[in-house]
Structures are given as structure tokens and as C-alpha cells.
């Protein structure tokens, strides 16, 4: 993980960059103990926080693992991501992780060529996506497959298709 505040009340995370997170999450580096219950990482995200605010951050080139997205509202209440930028993260732009992540807002952000699926609502009850611009490569789904069971509301979001196909 790049930056992860935990169990915090109103943490403010701004003006940061996370680049190439999770490059070392593999069996060669993490070999003991054998079963680690998944090797997961995201760029910048909170764990069990209340009213976390993430703004003016940039996350690029996060490697695919079970997560691999730039941003992740995970098991907290009231997480806000605003005015952030993400580019070419193999797990997508943002995940709203499961039923404990409530009252999340993702607004005024730019996602450019994030891969695997731009958003992952993952059984989330109530994410709000507002005034974002997503530049999505042709062939990449907007909602990530197998992480699509939650609900979200979009208000004034723009999805712009990039004019090139995925590398083969």
C-alpha cells in the first residue's frame, strides 16, 4: 500500500503521489508463511476511518493484485475523495469496499486509462460518484468484473472513450 491511515477520525491526506505500488507483492518476495490470505494493495486509502478526506493526490501504475486500484474507500464512514488524479492503475480507479464502507463520496476526480475496470462497487450500499471525468480505454469495462455487486449513484460524471485498444 502507498498511504493508509487507520482507525482515524477526520484524517486529511493531501498533496501526495504514490507510484508503482504493489510491484513487490508476489510469491518470490512474500513467500512465508505460505498462505497469506491474499496479497492485496491499493494506492491511497483509509481503513476503518470516520470522515477521511483525500484530495490533490496522484496515484499511478499500481500493480494488479486482488485489488490494485488507485483509491479504495474501505470499511469506514464518510470517506471523501476529491480533486485527485489516477493513471494506469491495473486494478482500476476506485473501489468502495463491502458493506461496512458507507456514506462515501468520489467527486471532481480524473481517472486516465485505469485498467481492469474503472470502478469497483464491491457490495457497497451507497457510493456517490459526482463530477468526475473518466478516460476509459476501449475494451476496459467501467465497472470491474467480479467486483460489481454494490450500488452507486452517478451525478454529472463524464466517461470519455480513449481512442486506442488494449495492448495484446
Predicted regions located by residue number:
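Right-handed parallel beta-helix
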Residues: 1-2, 7-34, 40-45, 50-63, ...
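Intrinsically disordered, low-complexity regulatory regions of eukaryotic regulatory proteins
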Residues: 70-72, 146
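Extracellular glycoside hydrolase catalytic/binding regions
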Residues: 94-96
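Repeat-solenoid scaffold signature
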Residues: 100-101, 123-124, 147
Amino acid at each position: 500500500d502507498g498511504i493508509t491511515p487507520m482507525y482515524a477520525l477526520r484524517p486529511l491526506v493531501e498533496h501526495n503521489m504514490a507510484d508503482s505500488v504493489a510491484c513487490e507483492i508476489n510469491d518470490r518476495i512474500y513467500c512465508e508463511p505460505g498462505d497469506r490470505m491474499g496479497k492485496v494493495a491499493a494506492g491511497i486509502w483509509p481503513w476503518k476511518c470516520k470522515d477521511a478526506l483525500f484530495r490533490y493526490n496522484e496515484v499511478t501504475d499500481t500493480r494488479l493484485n486482488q485489488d490494485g486500484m488507485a483509491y479504495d474507500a474501505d470499511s469506514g464512514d464518510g470517506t471523501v475523495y476529491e480533486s485527485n488524479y489516477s493513471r494506469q492503475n491495473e486494478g482500476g480507479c476506485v473501489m468502495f469496499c463491502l458493506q461496512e464502507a458507507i456514506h462515501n463520496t468520489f467527486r471532481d476526480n480524473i481517472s486516465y486509462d485505469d485498467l481492469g475496470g474503472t470502478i469497483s462497487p464491491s457490495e457497497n450500499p451507497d457510493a456517490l460518484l459526482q463530477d468526475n471525468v473518466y478516460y476509459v480505454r476501449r475494451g476496459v469495462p467501467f465497472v470491474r468484473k467480479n467486483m460489481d455487486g454494490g450500488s452507486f449513484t452517478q451525478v454529472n460524471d463524464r466517461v470519455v472513450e480513449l481512442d486506442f485498444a488494449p495492448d495484446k
